[in-house]
């Protein structure tokens, strides 16, 4: 059911290959700090796709998720909204209403990026302390991260604006 929801919401980015192509297109049109952040998001997206497509267990990718570019840009007070100068806010689209991403409607790019990296850091912290905790559904956590990354990609490509 969760994968069906993903397919419905993100049919334009419904595979690792199409997401990689979308990142490639965005990377070609961005330079400097924006490109650095997009490269990091691309890597994190690739890792989450491995879990979504059931190729690897979350335990193998969680330690590999990276936040270095984000952390550096955050320390420099980078304006993450510059990734999308024309489309600042997530539009109210029917495909988002009633979904677990509905809370992002009306949020700006910086808020979506912050939520992505907050999820990564939280997941890595909890995983580092108690990786074998059976009460934590690591697949669901990675899937939720994956959906946020795809939401950002769709917005940056203009699909949700």
Predicted regions: what they are:
Residues 1, 55, 59-62, 128, ...:
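Compositionally biased, intrinsically disordered low-complexity regions enriched
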Residues 62-90:
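Amphipathic alpha-helical blocks and their helix-capping loop/short-beta junctions
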Residues 1-27:
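Short, cationic, amphipathic peptide segments
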Residues 13, 20, 24, 31, ...:
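A near-ubiquitous, low-amplitude feature marking generic local secondary-structure context
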Residues 3-6, 27-41, 99-113, 139:
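Amphipathic, non-membrane alpha-helical segments in soluble helical-bundle scaffolds
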Residues 30-33, 44, 77-81, 133, ...:
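Detector for Asparagine
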